[in-house]
Amino acid sequence: MLDNTRLRIAIQKSGRLSDDSRELLARCGIKINLHTQRLIALAENMPIDILRVRDDDIPGLVMDGVVDLGIIGENVLEEELLTRRAQGEDPRYFTLRRLDFGGCRLSLAMAVDEAWDGPAALNGKRIATSYPHLLKRYLDQKGVQFKSCLLNGSVEVAPRAGLADAICDLVSTGATLEANGLREVEVIYRSKACLIQRDGEMPEAKQQLIDRLLTRIQGVIQARESKYIMMHAPTERLDEVIALLPGAERPTILPLAGDQQRVAMHMVSSETLFWETMEKLKALGASSILVLPIEKMME
């Protein structure tokens, strides 16, 4: 029996979002042994329980108030939302924030030798998918009449098996489509992982814990998107150097011993710092440029 005084978080047991969800919780300082087969894991240092379940169960667990929070792909969340609305329900939940992992797209795909001139090419076709409501919403908006073939896995084999004329499935690289003689023809939904919260009154202690967790998640994401930059920069071109490095705050400038022409500059900059930027810095006279990862960050 779960203790209702503890914060309950549902994550995917295995699959696309599982490892990233576990890493996020670990980097937030939540100490949990998630390497066993247990479906419920208790945090050692916080009043938090982690439920490891199928990804398509997570939205329902949150909407029904069984758990307090869930980490889930927006595609699965939206499909559950549309399913419940089609059944006359009024699902309630809050999206606390979008996360920085789990990116994918839900796309239409057809045989490589089939002509495609837009969604109208699917009129009267049978389409295999695990996302019937997302597919219906999109094609209804396009005025396309079609037949849906619901499959919960191996959707990409449906055309070759004679089950469907086209498919609507998640695409990451497109390699699976290519291996099955298909090509991506239209993106109908783009998704990332998100953190959702159940509707209804939350005990003050739980809400305070959620607020703490959100602050830590924000810090983890900012740290992943940022780098700590150190360099020696010429004083006469300092403004040009700073302009190349987008940062939340102004850099720290320190004098160099015995050098009046240069200063040491330290700053936190976004992940958009690529080799091209470093080459531009060098061209401006910067030297000893170091780019370091950030473990934790709080503004």
From Swiss-Prot:
Record's keyword annotation contains GTP-binding: no
Substrates-to-products reaction catalysed: 1-(5-phospho-beta-D-ribosyl)-ATP + diphosphate = 5-phospho-alpha-D-ribose 1-diphosphate + ATP
Annotated pathway: Amino-acid biosynthesis; L-histidine biosynthesis; L-histidine from 5-phospho-alpha-D-ribose 1-diphosphate: step 1/9
Name this polypeptide is given: ATP phosphoribosyltransferase
Similarity annotation: Belongs to the ATP phosphoribosyltransferase family. Long subfamily.
GO BP terms: L-histidine biosynthetic process
Chain's role: Catalyzes the condensation of ATP and 5-phosphoribose 1-diphosphate to form N'-(5'-phosphoribosyl)-ATP (PR-ATP). Has a crucial role in the pathway because the rate of histidine biosynthesis seems to be controlled primarily by regulation of HisG enzymatic activity.
Subunit-structure text: Equilibrium between an active dimeric form, an inactive hexameric form and higher aggregates. Interconversion between the various forms is largely reversible and is influenced by the natural substrates and inhibitors of the enzyme.
Cross-referenced CDD domains: PBP2_HisGL2 (cd13592)
Recorded superkingdom: Bacteria
InterPro entries recorded: ATP-PRT_HisG_long (IPR020621), ATP_PRibTrfase_cat (IPR013820), ATP_PRibTrfase_CS (IPR018198), ATP_PRibTrfase_HisG (IPR001348), HisG_C (IPR013115), N-reg_PII-like_a/b (IPR011322), N-reg_PII/ATP_PRibTrfase_C (IPR015867)
